[in-house]
């Protein structure tokens, strides 16, 4: 029963993060964002367009209370497929949006306070999709057979204001 409750809490956090991103984009002139559906469907979490600026983003959104957030390669691939199909847009980007919540899990049902962090990493349209991990400090790693290999992904300054966005060097 506890596992069902934990899974539900994680899903709710994910939906809230997606909803937050949609609201932030939709509050801006010229931007339109949409949540595209459930994880079982082969769709990105969020689709964002700006027709005047000829921009399309597909976003895979991850949030949590741990020290790392994981993105499976197939979720990156489905974002790439969508982004690459909309050739009419001059700027097409796959964005991995990470939100580390202000409470850090330190045990079952135990948390401690920390600063909320947000990272928006660009996954290249032609870059091969791999399982990857983002750390609380914004470092990216490829995760393969229990081994970590550094990944260099650029940060994308968002068109909306977020006092929690951190640009890594």
Q: Which sequence ranges carry the predicted segments?
A:
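Short, conserved, surface-exposed binding loops centered on an aromatic residue
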Residues: 24, 37-38, 49, 88
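Acidic-residue sensor for enzyme active/binding pockets
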Residues: 18, 60, 75
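Short acidic/glycine-enriched loop/turn segments that link adjacent beta-strands
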Residues: 40-43
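Structural signal for conserved beta-strand scaffold positions within catalytic alpha/beta enzyme cores
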Residues: 35, 60, 96-98
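Conserved catalytic cores of phosphodiester-cleaving nucleases, focusing on short active-site segments
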Residues: 25, 46-48, 54-65
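Domain-level recognition of nuclease-like catalytic cores that cleave nucleotide substrates
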Residues: 8-12, 93-169
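Acidic-basic catalytic patches of nuclease active cores, encompassing PD-(D/E)XK
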Residues: 1-37
């Amino acid at each position: 029963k506890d596992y069902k409750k934990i899974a539900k809490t994680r899903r709710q956090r994910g939906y809230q993060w997606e909803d937050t991103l949609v609201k932030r984009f939709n509050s801006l002139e010229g931007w339109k964002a949409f949540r595209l559906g459930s994880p079982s469907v082969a769709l990105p979490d969020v689709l964002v367009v700006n027709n005047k600026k000829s921009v399309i983003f597909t976003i895979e959104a991850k949030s949590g209370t741990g020290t790392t957030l994981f993105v499976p390669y197939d979720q990156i691939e489905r974002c790439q497929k969508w982004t690459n199909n909309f050739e009419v847009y001059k700027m097409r980007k796959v964005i991995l949006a990470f939100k580390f919540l202000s409470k850090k899990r330190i045990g079952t049902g135990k948390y401690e306070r920390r600063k909320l962090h947000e990272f928006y990493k660009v996954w290249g349209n032609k870059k091969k999709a791999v399982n990857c991990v983002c750390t609380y400090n914004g470092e990216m790693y490829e995760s393969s057979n229990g081994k970590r290999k550094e990944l260099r992904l650029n940060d994308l300054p968002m068109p909306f204001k977020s006092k929690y966005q951190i640009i890594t060097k």
